[in-house]
Amino acid sequence: MIGRLRGTLIEKLPPQILIEVGGIGYEVQMPMSCIYELPNIGEEAIIYTHFVVREDAQLLYGFNTVSERALFREVIKANGVGPKMGLAILSGMTANQFVTCVEKEDISTLIKLPGVGKKTAERLVVEMKDRLKGWGAGDLFTPATDAAPVDSTPVIAQNAQEEAMSALLALGYKPPQASKAVSQVAKAGMSSEELIREALKSMV
């Protein structure tokens, strides 16, 4: 099992990144809340991974901290929640925000996440509330920030919007929903990561 990768960040194609370790490039699926905190392209990154083996694929899911990975593993234990939905949940909100929603039984916020209906939201609360006691205390997760993403490479607006749309669709949002969210938050000069961040905020 691959549990940790340390290497050079080669690409950010949200919600996927490419990290090179010992001359080998690993494709890793990451929640947007974690991608925002990554270093610049070309710099060293440390990713804690969860390895999933399916009949048709072998997938790596990555996180910036051991605690974020642990939360992801708890989320996908819930009945009816797989890795793809777990990724979408932790992209729509930070780990701390998710823990708070579960603790407060905030169903109305959880159902705004892609693929999460009322029954799934209720199941998450019922199954996870006791398991997550104490998780919201202290600095267990990557601190949430409203600052711009660290990658300041200029991006052509149209390309940024296309990349943002692709990321939202990969996370499970419907095309009309994704298009509307991106259009509403788009501003001149925004990078694709900024667009994704603001679009996700507008839908939660």
From Swiss-Prot:
Region spans: Flexible linker: 144-155
Pfam families with a match to the protein in the record: HHH_5, RuvA_C, RuvA_N
Keyword Ubl conjugation: no
Chief localisation class: cytoplasm
Taxonomic superkingdom: Bacteria
Residues covered by region (Domain II): 65-143
A GO term from the CC aspect: Holliday junction helicase complex
Residue span of region Domain III: 156-204
GO annotation terms (biological process): DNA recombination; DNA repair; SOS response
SUPFAM superfamilies per UniProt: DNA helicase RuvA subunit, C-terminal domain (SSF46929), Nucleic acid-binding proteins (SSF50249), RuvA domain 2-like (SSF47781)
Entry keyword Nucleotide-binding: no
Region spans: Domain I: 1-64
Keywords per UniProt: Cytoplasm, DNA damage, DNA recombination, DNA repair, DNA-binding
Location(s), subcellular: Cytoplasm
One term of GO molecular function: four-way junction helicase activity
Function per UniProt: The RuvA-RuvB-RuvC complex processes Holliday junction (HJ) DNA during genetic recombination and DNA repair, while the RuvA-RuvB complex plays an important role in the rescue of blocked DNA replication forks via replication fork reversal (RFR). RuvA specifically binds to HJ cruciform DNA, conferring on it an open structure. The RuvB hexamer acts as an ATP-dependent pump, pulling dsDNA into and through the RuvAB complex. HJ branch migration allows RuvC to scan DNA until it finds its consensus sequence, where it cleaves and resolves the cruciform DNA.
Oligomer status and interactors: Homotetramer. Forms an RuvA(8)-RuvB(12)-Holliday junction (HJ) complex. HJ DNA is sandwiched between 2 RuvA tetramers; dsDNA enters through RuvA and exits via RuvB. An RuvB hexamer assembles on each DNA strand where it exits the tetramer. Each RuvB hexamer is contacted by two RuvA subunits (via domain III) on 2 adjacent RuvB subunits; this complex drives branch migration. In the full resolvosome a probable DNA-RuvA(4)-RuvB(12)-RuvC(2) complex forms which resolves the HJ.
Family the entry assigns: Belongs to the RuvA family.
Record remark on domains: Has three domains with a flexible linker between the domains II and III and assumes an 'L' shape. Domain III is highly mobile and contacts RuvB.
Protein name: Holliday junction branch migration complex subunit RuvA
Organism: Vibrio cholerae serotype O1 (strain ATCC 39315 / El Tor Inaba N16961)
Higher taxonomy: Bacteria, Pseudomonadati, Pseudomonadota, Gammaproteobacteria, Vibrionales
